[in-house]
UniProtKB/Swiss-Prot annotation:
Residues in coiled coil: none
UniProt name for this protein: Myophilin
CDD domains according to UniProt: CH_dMP20-like (cd21207)
Species in which this protein is naturally found: Echinococcus granulosus
GO cellular component terms given for this protein: actin cytoskeleton
Length: 190
């Protein structure tokens, strides 16, 4: 990360757009949830991304949700490959727990601070997934996942649906913008 030059041009605009997607309230809510589950007291004087960057807090979070799912945590890691190993172990444990792959962040999103908002969205996805596991009794993070509401119709109900008169569907004859011209007409030959 130290040899990466500061972004300029289009990269700078992309970085600013990604930073604009961050929500400090959600980040604080995620940190409170982590503290409640792990029992850790996180250093809130640090930046959100710096608290999570080495991956140890995330690994401890996953082990508190599903004990023993991450066997090796590289504590106090300073070497980049050890830090990335922690983050990768966390992501693999989340996949195994049932978090959809589409909701996971990439290792570089956290390690190189590329997309911190995606890291927060991943934590909220983990919170939603926890609520689907009956053995989970911890605090809630984010909304509950929707459950399937399958409908069963009898053959008679399906036949009755075919008897609906087309006039009951509604009308497609109403106000439209056909024929409306705004401003002066364009004259090709004046």
């Amino acid at each position: 990360m130290s040899n990466v030059p500061p972004p300029s041009g289009l990269s700078y605009q992309v970085k600013k757009k990604l930073e604009g997607k961050r929500d400090k309230d959600q980040e604080n809510e995620a940190l409170e949830w982590i503290e409640a589950l792990t029992g850790l007291k996180l250093d809130r004087s640090k930046l959100y991304e710096d608290i999570l960057k080495d991956g140890t807090v995330l690994c401890k979070l996953m082990n508190s949700i599903k004990p023993g799912c991450i066997k090796k945590i590289n504590e106090n890691a300073t070497m980049p490959f050890k830090i990335m190993e922690n983050i990768s172990a966390f992501l693999e444990a989340m996949k195994g727990y049932g978090v959809p792959v589409a909701d996971l962040f990439q290792t570089v999103d956290l390690f190189e601070k590329k997309d911190i908002a995606q890291v927060t969205r991943t934590l909220f996805a983990l919170g939603r997934t926890c609520q689907t596991h009956p053995e989970y009794s911890g605090p809630v993070l984010g909304p509950k996942l929707a459950t399937e509401n399958k409908r069963e119709f009898t053959e008679q109900q399906l036949r009755e649906g075919q008897n609906v008169v087309s006039l009951q569907y509604g009308s497609n004859k109403g106000a439209s913008q056909a024929g409306i011209n705004m401003g002066k007409q364009r004259m090709i030959m004046d």
